[in-house]
Amino acid sequence: WQETLHPQTIDLGLERVRVVLRRLQLEPPAYTVITVGGTNGKGSCVAFLDAMLRAAGYRVGAYTSPHLLRYNERIRINNVEVDDAALCRTFARIDAARGDISLTYFEFGTLAALEQFQEAGVDIAILEVGLGGRLDAVNIVDAAAALVVSIALDHTDWLGADRDSIGYEKAGIYRAGQPGV
């Protein structure tokens, strides 16, 4: 269903998603955000941070992609996948809030994760970048800390033909005055 709502699979840019985020009243988030980008190793980094922060006593939300078996794997709270009913409620709320704004599959999922984290009252949300960083949907919220795991030639049609261009796109998740690794 979500795949039919947008004419393109990838549509880099943040304004459409920001409008829906505001309509959902999810800005600013009530939790700390850590954004993880890079070419390879993002999922492993998210899993490590998630485990470490939970061991320290934090309530943690983690958003990753793609999923392996079930969509619900993408959104976890304290390492438990959100259930179908919660996802359906959230998707319906996003669909109503978007009005005539088209959202990609990934943008829908990102908004669903942010909504679920808000609803669950997480302390920290770890968001994995889907593509690039600067114009990726997870970049609609300002991260308190951002990590770029690696930079290699990937998605050159979207991010640029060399490591410098790709690095620039991935570095777009950093915020002035906030820790970056």
Regions found by a protein language model. Give the residues of each.
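Charged, amphipathic alpha-helical linker segments immediately N-terminal to NTP-binding catalytic cores
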Residues: W1-Q8
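ATP-dependent carboxylate-amine ligase
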Residues: Q2, V141-A143
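ATP-dependent carboxylate-amine ligase catalytic core
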Residues: Q8-I10, L14-Y31, A55-V141, L153, ...
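A conserved segment at the C-terminal end of the G1
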Residues: V36, S44-G61
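Internal gly/pro-rich beta-alpha loop/helix module
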Residues: A144, W158-V181
